[in-house]
Amino acid sequence: MTEYEGPKTKFHALMQEQIHNEFTAAQQYVAIAVYFDSEDLPQLAKHFYSQAVEERNHAMMLVQHLLDRDLRVEIPGVDTVRNQFDRPREALALALDQERTVTDQVGRLTAVARDEGDFLGEQFMQWFLQEQIEEVALMATLVRVADRAGANLFELENFVAREVDVAPAASGAPHAAGGRL
């Protein structure tokens, strides 16, 4: 077997980085979900456990894309995540910041694919761009609702139970290596 020489293109290298970012995001959402569970906020906990699975699935979609293109994949470790929050709004604000960062990362991936003439890579990233619009909008809404609810966390929980859909991945989503959880 020959020794791995690293990514073939800048897009491939950024895809490897994004796999790391998505797995780290999944772990961060588990930490946020556990925080909400510890605060007896079951609706928020349920939502963030679901978000963690979604982020894991995103990582595996990236893996599958690279495998489909006969490119080597390295499964990375994850960064340390934040576990302590003073109040629910703080955890929600972190999630919003994280989604905005991911949006920037996905935009950069798409631009690099275009710059390199990687039309397959650019087309693949289009689904992720649309997904990020939805994710940022939802997290921004949750932060606003938390601000309005103030100390009345029951209102925030009611909003999540009533308005936040824990739905399966949208049709047209890329396949995830090993299947979606």
Curated annotation (Swiss-Prot):
* A GO MF term: ferroxidase activity
Residue stretches in coiled coil: none
Domain annotation Ferritin-like diiron: ranges: 5-150
Swiss-Prot/TrEMBL catalytic activity: 4 Fe(2+) + O2 + 4 H(+) = 4 Fe(3+) + 2 H2O
Q: Which UniProt keywords apply?
A: Encapsulin nanocompartment, Iron, Iron storage, Metal-binding, Oxidoreductase, Virulence
What GO CC annotations are associated with the protein? cytoplasm; cytosol; encapsulin nanocompartment; extracellular region; peptidoglycan-based cell wall; plasma membrane
| Induction statement | Induced by 1 mM reactive nitrogen intermediate sodium nitroprusside dihydrate (at protein level). Induced by exposure to 50 uM FeCl(3). A possible member of the dormancy regulon. Induced in response to reduced oxygen tension (hypoxia), repressed by carbon monoxide (CO). It is hoped that this regulon will give insight into the latent, or dormant phase of infection.
What InterPro entries does its record include? Ferritin, Ferritin-like, Ferritin-like_diiron, Ferritin-like_SF, Ferritin_DPS_dom, Ferritin_prok
Practical applications: As this protein can be easily produced at high concentrations upon expression in E.coli and is highly stable, it is a good model protein for testing new microscopes.
> What happens biologically when this protein's gene is inactivated, per the record?
A single deletion is more sensitive to oxidative stress (cumene hydroperoxide but not plumbagin). A double bfrA-bfrB mutant grows 40% less well in the presence of an iron chelator, is more sensitive to oxidative stress, has significantly reduced pathological effects in guinea pigs and a marked reduction in its survival in human macrophages.
Q: Which EC class does it fall in?
A: oxidoreductase
Locate the residues binding Fe cation 1.
E22, E55, H58
Ranges for the region named Targeting peptide are 163-181
Subcellular location(s) of the protein: Encapsulin nanocompartment
The UniProt entry's GO biological process terms, in alphabetical order, are: intracellular iron ion homeostasis; iron ion transport; response to hypoxia; response to nitrosative stress
UniProt-listed Enzyme Commission number(s) = 1.16.3.1
Chain's role:
Possible cargo protein of a type 1 encapsulin nanocompartment involved in protection against oxidative stress. Iron-storage protein that displays ferroxidase activity, catalyzing the oxidation of Fe(2+) ions into Fe(3+) ions, that can then be deposited as a ferric-oxide mineral core within the central cavity of the protein complex. Retains ferroxidase activity inside the encapsulin nanocompartment with a slight decrease in rate. It is not known if this protein is normally found in the encapsulin nanocompartment.
What note about domains is in the entry? The C-terminus (residues 163-181) targets the protein to the encapsulin nanocompartment. Interestingly the C-terminus is localized iside the ferritin cage, in theory it does not touch the interior of the nanocompartment.
State the family named in the UniProt similarity comment for this chain. Answer: Belongs to the ferritin-like superfamily. Prokaryotic family.
Q: How does it assemble?
A: Homooligomer of 24 subunits that are packed together to form an approximately spherical molecule 12-13 nm in diameter with a central cavity, in which large amounts of iron can be stored.
Entry protein name: Bacterioferritin BfrB
Q: Which organism is it from?
A: Mycobacterium tuberculosis (strain ATCC 25618 / H37Rv)
Q: Which gene encodes it?
A: bfrB
